[in-house]
Design a protein with these regions (language model features):
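Short polybasic/polar patches that bind polyanions
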Residues: 60, 64, 105, 131
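Solvent-exposed coil/turn segments that connect beta secondary-structure elements
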Residues: 79-82, 102, 147, 175
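Substrate-binding/active-site groove segments that recognize
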Residues: 86-110, 121-130, 142, 148-149, ...
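Catalytic and substrate-binding regions of cell-wall glycan-acting enzymes that process beta-1,4-linked
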Residues: 140-186
């Protein structure tokens, strides 16, 4: 049960907080030793140049502030932009996390080509998607690529080749099917049944 909790909060009893801190400390140390990566998965930061490694370090520092596993954020950036802060898609998706202008505005990104600003906006959006899909990584990744409307309409990963390949690439780097999420952020998608556990 404790592994389903993201962390202690005001409603968490002292004995649960103590146990949670002890159990997650070891888990976090093990994950940190692997660079935030899942064992047996491709490393999205393998072979990065020193300047791109600085971006990866920034992601590792910022992701926990948004309740996002660094490994998932790094996988997204590897697939979205290959760590190019100036990436620009034909659909006008911009920067490291390939934010379209509407999403950038929605998550208060002033300059999508500024690495820190882009990462913060992308993490905020990813955090929202994880809450909306109750921690289901595949659905959150599919929605990051195709939009939550498309995922809801199709009741899962849309039958778009690009999105299906995208989800496969994310899974190659980040294998977890479920991610912790903040259930207070947004009501879950009406297209998927409510699940217990995984939320604060």
């Amino acid at each position: 049960m404790l592994t389903l909790l993201k962390g202690p909060n005001a409603r968490t009893s002292e004995c649960v907080r103590t146990a949670l801190n002890a159990s997650t400390r070891g888990m976090d140390a093990a994950r940190a030793a692997r660079g935030g990566m899942e064992p047996g998965r491709a490393n999205p930061t393998a072979g990065l140049s020193p300047d791109k490694q600085e971006i990866a370090d920034l992601v590792r520092a910022l992701a926990p502030q948004y309740g996002v596993e660094p490994g998932l954020a790094l996988a997204l950036i590897r697939v979205e932009s290959n760590f190019d802060p100036y990436a620009l898609s034909p659909m006008n998706a911009q920067g490291l996390m390939q934010l379209i202008p509407g999403t950038a505005r929605r998550f208060n990104v002033r300059n999508a080509f500024d690495p820190a600003d882009n990462i913060r906006g992308g993490l905020a959006y990813l955090r929202w998607l994880l809450a909306y899909y109750q921690g289901r990584v595949v659905l959150a990744a599919a929605a990051y690529n195709a939009g939550e409307g498309a995922v809801d309409r199709h009741g899962g990963v849309p039958p778009y080749r690009e999105t299906q390949e995208y989800v496969g690439k994310i899974a190659r780097f980040f294998g977890a099917e479920q991610h912790l999420y903040d259930g207070r952020l947004v009501d879950p998608s009406p297209a998927f049944p409510r699940r217990g556990g995984g939320a604060l």
